[in-house]
Amino acid sequence: MGAVSDVLVMSDYTRMRQWSLAIGVAIVGVAILASQGYIDTSKSIYTSNRFLYLSTIIGSLCFGFGMVLASGCGSKTLVRIGGGNLKSVVVFFVLGLVSYMTLKGFLAVLRVNTIDTLFLPLSTTQDLPSILATQTNIAKAHLQLILGLLIGGAFILFALLKKSFWQRDNLLAGGGVGLAIIAIWWISGYLGFIAEDPKTLEEVFLVTNSGRMESLSFVAPYAYTLDWLILFSDTSKVLTLGIVAVGGMIIGAFLSAILTKTFRWETFHGVEDTGNHLLGACLLYTSPSPRD
């Protein structure tokens, strides 16, 4: 949101280039992991063979509006909590509640029986290499590497074209996020993967709540974090990648705020401000598809 506003209001592409660098590094890294057989992206939670087009459209619109009203997305909320923002603490709990309702509660039933019934069935998983592999004679692994290098390289090129962008903070911000995403894919899809669970004799991904391969996500893990805290005495509730990432973001943001002396308490400025943040928190996970 901040990157888009910088471009539209000030014609400043610095943060947009940071995002572009992060996206490019992540795409290239994941493509290399997949092409070398370390992970299988077709087994991730994001690549089913059903394209839920209406859920995706409505969810994206809700998320966009919610992000503006709540002063940021799920990850930004965690950063603001670490910096002393009490408004974001409220957003965290409301968003966690609504996300749980959307995953397993009232909104889940509504979602599954309405807009999730509208989808496009695909003959393969919905990642681009799998789709193109069925249309060409090129092996999927080769397509993963080629497309990853081309698309990811284009994002990296856009970021680095501006010489003024070549500063340590910009490169660390973009490159660091991209490398973190690659690391999470590796942990989720390779390190935490068992080809045959002794109990079920089926393959399993150990470190995620969904039981499938995931990358960094900061909305559904809100619900999982609250669930873990509320049912802490239940030994079946274990720390997962998403829950640890939520805690790590808050702790990291807090330490950064202390070291840079930017930590300060902040709260709502009035009824309108409170209402906007509450509505924004609800919209952030009134996205029908539980894939975030």
What is each stretch, according to the model?
Residues 66, 70-120:
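Membrane-interface helix-loop-helix junctions at boundaries between adjacent transmembrane segments
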